[in-house]
C-alpha cells in the first residue's frame, strides 16, 4: 500500500513539468494581442508595415501561437495612407494570460479598453517596463491618432512610414497609461507624443531617450 502511494506521488510530480508547458501552449494559442518583446534593433525602421507584420508573426509563432495572421498596430501617411485601426481585425483581443483588452475596434479606441501595464504584456507573458522602472520603455510606436487613424501628410509621425532610423518622428503611446501629468495624452496607449532626438527621433538612441525601445503592438487580424 505504502509503495503504491509513493509511486502515485512520484508519477504526479513527474507530470507537473509537462503540465506547465501545456498550459503555456494553451495560453499562447488563445493569445490575440501582445506588445513585442523586442524591436527591430534599428529604431523605428521596421522595414515598413510588411516588416513590422513579419516581426509580429515571427514572435507569435516562436511563443507557440500558430494559425493566426498577425498585424502591427501602425498607421502610415501620404499616398495610400493606412489606418492602424483598419488592419487589426474585428476583435475581441486578449493577451497571453487570457485578459481581454477590448471586445472590438470601437471598444479598443474608447475609454473602456483594458490596456494597462498589467495587461499590455509581451508574447511571452512578461511585463514591459513603465514609468518608474529602469529603463523606462513605455513608449510604444503607433504613428496614429487617438482614434486609430493616420495623420495627414506633412509633419512626419511615422518615421517615413517605418523605414527611417534617423530623420523624422513617430507618434508613440504609453502602454502603462502614465506620463508627466494627468492629461489625456499622457494616459493614451496610442497617441501620447512624437519621438524626438538630435538628428531626428527615429534612431534606437532617440527612442530610448524619451522612454522607448522601438516596441509596438501586435494584433491577430483573424
PLM region spans:
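Bacterial N-terminal signal peptides that target proteins for export
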Residues: 1-10, 18-22
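Secreted/extracellular ectodomain signature
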Residues: 23-222
Amino acid at each position: 500500500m505504502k509503495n503504491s502511494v509513493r509511486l502515485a506521488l512520484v508519477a504526479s510530480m513527474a507530470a507537473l513539468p509537462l503540465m506547465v508547458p501545456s498550459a503555456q501552449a494553451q495560453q499562447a494559442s488563445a493569445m490575440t494581442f501582445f506588445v513585442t518583446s523586442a524591436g527591430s534593433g534599428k529604431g523605428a525602421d521596421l522595414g515598413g508595415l510588411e516588416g513590422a507584420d513579419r516581426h509580429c508573426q515571427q514572435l507569435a509563432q516562436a511563443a507557440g501561437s500558430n494559425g493566426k495572421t498577425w498585424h502591427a498596430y501602425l498607421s502610415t501617411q501620404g499616398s495610400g495612407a493606412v489606418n492602424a485601426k483598419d488592419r487589426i481585425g474585428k476583435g475581441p483581443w486578449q493577451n497571453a494570460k487570457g485578459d481581454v483588452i477590448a471586445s472590438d475596434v470601437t471598444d479598443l479606441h474608447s475609454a473602456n479598453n483594458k490596456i494597462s501595464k498589467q495587461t499590455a504584456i509581451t508574447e511571452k507573458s512578461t511585463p514591459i517596463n513603465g514609468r518608474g522602472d529602469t529603463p523606462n520603455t513605455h513608449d510604444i510606436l503607433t504613428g496614429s491618432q487617438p482614434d486609430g487613424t493616420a495623420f495627414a501628410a506633412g509633419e512626419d509621425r511615422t518615421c517615413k512610414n517605418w523605414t527611417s532610423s534617423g530623420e523624422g518622428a513617430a507618434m508613440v503611446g504609453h502602454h502603462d497609461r502614465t506620463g508627466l501629468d494627468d492629461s489625456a495624452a499622457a494616459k493614451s496607449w496610442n497617441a501620447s507624443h512624437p519621438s524626438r532626438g538630435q538628428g531626428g527621433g527615429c534612431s534606437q538612441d532617440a527612442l530610448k531617450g524619451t522612454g522607448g525601445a522601438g516596441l509596438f503592438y501586435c494584433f491577430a487580424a483573424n
